[in-house]
């Protein structure tokens, strides 16, 4: 259920874009992200920082897109969110307070060195996605960017998540690996 809620704004954005245009889709994205927060809080009685940051970015850049009738703002939102994620992960790792370890470390007991590898992998991933988004958003047609944002970035994120899980699994202690089989 939680994963469906995470994808709800993206699905609504894509569907509304296909039937209308980028401006109506941007307004729908703002509304869907707000709805996501309300439903998430109603079901789980808490909100993650990532959801709040995403909502703030969607609201700011979506509103700018609507007010100035310029799709560049909603396109930049993707890169800025990825840059913030990369920055947060990188700074936390430099301070020896891995965000990924704090999120997953209770379930996956691996060495700090492995958490550092995973963190820098995701920093690189987010940075590269942000840069590729700039290229696709401003060098290719709007339709291509929307498809890239919805399908390309989602697929890349899922693939990288699977790669990360396999990498972490490989470095789990033997007794914990047996528990997962």
Swiss-Prot record:
Pfam families, alphabetized: IspA
Subcellular location: Cell inner membrane
NCBIfam families per the UniProt record, alphabetical: ispZ (TIGR00997), PRK00259.1-2 (NF001324), PRK00259.1-3 (NF001325)
Keywords: Cell inner membrane, Cell membrane, Membrane, Transmembrane, Transmembrane helix
Any Gene Ontology CC annotation: plasma membrane
Similarity field: Belongs to the YciB family.
PANTHER family recorded: INNER MEMBRANE-SPANNING PROTEIN YCIB (PTHR36917:SF1), INTRACELLULAR SEPTATION PROTEIN A-RELATED (PTHR36917)
Keyword Ligase appears in the UniProt entry: no
Membrane topology: Multi-pass membrane protein
Segments crossing the lipid bilayer: 10-30, 50-70, 72-92, 118-138, 148-168
Biological function: Plays a role in cell envelope biogenesis, maintenance of cell envelope integrity and membrane homeostasis.
Record-given protein name: Inner membrane-spanning protein YciB
């Amino acid at each position: 259920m939680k994963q469906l809620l995470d994808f709800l704004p993206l699905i609504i954005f894509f569907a509304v874009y296909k039937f209308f245009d980028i401006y109506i889709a941007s307004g729908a994205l703002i509304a869907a992200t707000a709805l996501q927060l309300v439903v998430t809080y109603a079901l789980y009685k808490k909100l993650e920082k990532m959801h709040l940051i995403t909502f703030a970015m969607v609201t700011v850049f979506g509103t700018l897109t609507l007010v100035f009738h310029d799709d560049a703002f909603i396109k930049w939102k993707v890169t800025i969110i990825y840059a913030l994620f990369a920055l947060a992960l990188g700074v936390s790792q430099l301070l020896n307070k891995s965000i990924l370890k704090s999120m997953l470390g209770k379930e996956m007991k691996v060495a700090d060195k492995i958490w550092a590898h995973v963190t820098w992998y995701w920093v690189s991933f987010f940075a590269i996605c942000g840069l590729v988004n700039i290229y696709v958003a401003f060098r290719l047609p709007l339709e291509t960017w929307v498809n890239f944002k919805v399908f390309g970035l989602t697929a890349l994120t899922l693939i990288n998540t699977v790669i990360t899980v396999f990498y972490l699994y490989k470095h789990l202690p033997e007794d914990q690996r047996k528990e997962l089989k």
